[in-house]
Amino acid sequence: MQNYYEKEVLITSTYADRRCEVGIFQAGILIQDAMTEFFHQYDCDAIQMSRTHQAVWAIARTKIFMDQDILWMDRIRIKIFPVKISNVAIHLNILFESLDGHPLLRARQELCAIDSVNHTLRRIDTTPFPMDLPPMEPVLTAPCRRMKLKLGPEHQLYTHTVRTMDTDMNQHMNNTSYFRLILDTHPSSFWDTWKVQEFDIHHVNESVEGEELCQEEPGALSAQIKRGETTLIKAFLLLTPRESA
């Protein structure tokens, strides 16, 4: 049984930002698509697994490292594979590379299975995922960053009401929508000066349609999205100045 999923992608408008390059939000979409296709080949993507085993995948943590700019009309190869499989979590690595094999982006994700009815944690062996799938060598060994954020009202930048188009097939906030909210804490002039080199996000709680989110951050590097006193996500962005800035 093949222990990875691989495909080629042409970077068109769907995957490019206002600077005609793959930003963190677009990278999140590409990673999410690849993850879905990876699980689909084992008959356990979210739709199939919710129907047959009443379970869905929940992303706990994601870390993305940008090695090189990915630009409009670049053709790239995306590869996703497991690096560790435990009783309660699957650890994936994702590699974006040029067609001649140069790394462009490396990422790691930690996922768990939760019950689609009561949202309790499920053991991986209660899903169709093949537990005997041999892991591969990681391409990103740096650990996910530990974040202890306790931000108050003085750090609030804006609020956002979750609406229909923010949600996915599980009727909860789509993971990539959080990426967009974080980037929207700063105007385009800021992102014309700085780009994200490294991005960590921890998904702590879910958000559903109609709930308000408070986007907060103490500076340019850390962000927290809260609903009242409940933390939904914590994120850290390592920035680097653009050469043209």
Residue ranges of each PLM-predicted region?
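Short, well-ordered turn and helix-capping elements at secondary-structure junctions
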Residues: S13-Y15, M66-Q68, T164, D200-N205
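HotDog/MaoC-like acyl-thioester-processing domains
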Residues: Q2-K7, K63-L149, H203-E209, P218-A245
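Generic structural motif
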Residues: I78-I80, L157, F199, Q215
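A conserved acidic, glycine/proline-rich C-terminal tail/linker
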Residues: S189-E217
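Hot-dog-fold acyl-thioester-processing enzymes
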Residues: M1-I59, R106-R108, I114-Q197
